[in-house]
């Protein structure tokens, strides 16, 4: 079932200023997205691969950090909880202190730049900071190099992280779990966090991974793509009926109030425990332009066809959905807003976020 959201747009535009009052926590796997920019004009004599002449390097937040960056860009107060790699250093008093490794320090610098709280970010000398290094030349990604560990956190590190999170729940309007299977979120840890949030009346929004089907019981909403949803129900989602059947099956499996299945160029489908029918929102993509100096504008692209770079689009959906519901929107309105935000970020290269001005302009374009 598709719905006309024309009547929702004025409500959502009035909702945007409320984002600045929201306090959102993000718990999950922290990553540094590193870009090596260069030029390529020749092939290597050693192999049939291009030689890239290095020009510059840039770092930005990935994983749970990208979720936090999306929330911060929309004006929310964000506190991030996760783990970076560390190294031990000897103090003058003779003791040892764990400091973030090079990538962890770069990640923390990115967090400070985005004004994201880092009190919940631990450095662990037994781990490395996850880094996704992309080599870009001629506007194309040549190769990606991953540096990471996927095993679970040590029990003492997990306990420290939980003890950092627990007192913060009193100030949070929502908590987002961003699970990339890099070791921070385990079944047991997720269950402890969900239980604590339930006791504190904090709604939880989850982007799950395929190895954890039953760890998120009690979440307000689960966000997954068609591939992940198909894995959960052990069959490919190839048409509307298979998507609807999967959504209905996942509600009791996850034990959550709602399931949101993102479908790329086909938009998203929303399933709620309280509704016998599902809601479908068609995709819309935008290309960010600047109509006037200093004034962000949105040029509407082709609906359901013009997709540029989907890196981090799922993080955008998760972020906006959680923030909008925390600010008072219905799940349907929040999903429509999240779908609109995703349509903006796919027009940007790499992991990206959307500003309130861009989102308001995109809503205006849809209304026209």
Residue ranges and their predicted role:
Residues 2-15, 23, 45, 49-131, ...:
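Substrate-binding N-lobe of the ribokinase-like
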Residues 25, 79-82, 120, 174-176, ...:
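A structural signal for isolated positions on well-ordered beta-strands in alpha/beta enzyme cores
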Residues 30, 180, 316:
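Active-site metal-binding loops of divalent metal-dependent hydrolases
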Residues 44-52, 138-151, 224-232:
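Gly-rich Lys/Arg/Thr-decorated short loops/hinges at beta-loop-alpha junctions or inter-strand turns
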Residues 83, 113, 121-127, 134-169:
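Conserved phosphate-binding/catalytic loop of the ribokinase/pfkB sugar-kinase fold
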Residues 171-184:
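Short acidic, glycine-rich surface-loop motifs adjacent to enzyme active sites
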Residues 182-300:
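Conserved phosphate/ATP/ADP-binding segment of small-molecule kinases
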Residues 253-257, 287-366:
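Conserved post-catalytic alpha-helical subdomain immediately downstream of the catalytic base
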